[in-house]
């Protein structure tokens, strides 16, 4: 059993969530209750993202930026793009709906 570091809530509206593999992600304070889950890192097309499993080892993969995008009311039938290209920057001003075209 490996314990992850507790999230860091700064006074500037940003919460840092510590992930597996020594990585971290940042979210806005409005989403900081998501820090209560254990998040890990996965790589897709060379970009790192935060995810967690629901329902055990063979359960569903919940991707952090898509969970935040849903809370923002973004259309999840689209891709969710990280404006700055950093898949671990999950602040709301860095997420937008985009097409794959």
Task: Describe each region flagged by the PLM.
Residues 1-80, 84-101:
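Conserved recognition-core residues within compact binding domains
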């Amino acid at each position: 059993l490996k314990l992850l570091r507790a999230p860091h809530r700064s006074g500037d509206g940003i919460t840092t969530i510590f992930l597996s593999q020594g990585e971290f992600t940042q979210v806005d304070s409005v989403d900081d209750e998501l820090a209560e889950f254990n998040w890990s890192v996965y790589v897709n097309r060379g970009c790192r993202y935060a995810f967690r499993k629901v329902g055990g080892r063979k359960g569903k993969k919940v991707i952090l930026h898509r969970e935040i995008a849903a809370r923002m009311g973004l259309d999840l039938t689209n891709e969710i793009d990280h404006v700055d290209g950093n898949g671990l920057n999950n602040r709301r001003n860095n997420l937008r709906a985009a097409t794959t075209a």
